[in-house]
């Protein structure tokens, strides 16, 4: 009976190891590809790959090293995008600037919506297009959204109303695109998978 039990334990152990080997192999390829992307300065792709590697087997050495890289890259990429978004931005609507101009859907009520971004806060203003008078509507502290430590999402912020917005810039860093990807409620985070609210902002010189 004792020998049978030992055999079953060994058999189970061997089965588990055999099943985990493909995962470790896949994790290794993701990690190596992430390192390659990092060396090429493709930091966004590297972050995504390190994130995948960290989730496959978070307890092994590759998993632990990957999560460290995720944290480092998030910090680096957030600093990079923050350096570019500091300043004033005029809202163009829920379409790209070229589309707004082409269809002539600019706001005509004499009020522009403006946001000013600094290292810690986002200030929302209404600006009278005739008098240029600015009225502060609300202020939001910049708080990055981090559901999981291993998450590859680095440019999402959560506002005081629980809405979560992912932010991105165009190549020239003069158009800011924000999209509502989720909302935090008492029941947890609800992802928005369709009809996401979007906003486009152009840099004010």
Question: PLM features: residue spans?
Answer:
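Bacterial Sec-dependent N-terminal signal peptides
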Residues: 1-23
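Alpha-helical protein-protein interaction scaffolds
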Residues: 19-79
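Contiguous, well-ordered beta-strand patches that form the walls/edges
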Residues: 24, 94-101, 119-186
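N-terminal helix-cap/turn-to-beta initiation motif at the start of protein domains
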Residues: 74-90
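Flexible low-complexity loop/turn motifs enriched in small/helix-breaking residues
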Residues: 81, 95, 110-127, 205
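Acidic, glycine/proline-rich Ca2+-coordinating loop motifs
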Residues: 91-92, 195
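Surface-exposed strand-loop-strand hairpins of Gram-negative outer-membrane beta-barrel proteins
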Residues: 100-108
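Edge beta-strand at a domain terminus
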Residues: 180-205
């Amino acid at each position: 009976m004792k020998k049978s039990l030992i055999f079953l334990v060994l058999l189970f152990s061997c089965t588990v190891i055999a099943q985990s080997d493909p995962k470790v192999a896949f994790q290794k390829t993701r990690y190596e590809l992430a390192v390659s992307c990092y060396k090429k300065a493709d930091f966004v792709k590297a972050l995504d790959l390190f994130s995948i590697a960290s989730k496959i087997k978070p307890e092994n050495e590759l998993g632990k090293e990957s999560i460290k890289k995720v944290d480092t890259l998030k910090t680096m990429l957030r600093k990079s995008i923050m350096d570019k978004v500091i300043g004033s931005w005029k809202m163009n609507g829920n379409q790209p600037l070229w589309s707004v101009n082409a269809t002539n859907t600019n706001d005509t009520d004499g009020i522009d919506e403006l946001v000013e971004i600094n290292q810690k806060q986002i200030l929302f203003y209404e600006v009278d297009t005739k008098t240029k008078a600015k009225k502060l509507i609300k202020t939001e502290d910049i708080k990055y959204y981090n559901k999981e430590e291993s998450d590859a999402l680095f440019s999402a912020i959560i506002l005081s109303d629980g809405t979560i917005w992912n932010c991105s810039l165009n190549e020239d860093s003069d158009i800011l695109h924000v999209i509502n990807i989720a909302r935090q409620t008492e029941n947890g985070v609800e992802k928005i998978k369709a009809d996401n609210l979007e906003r486009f902002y152009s840099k004010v010189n």
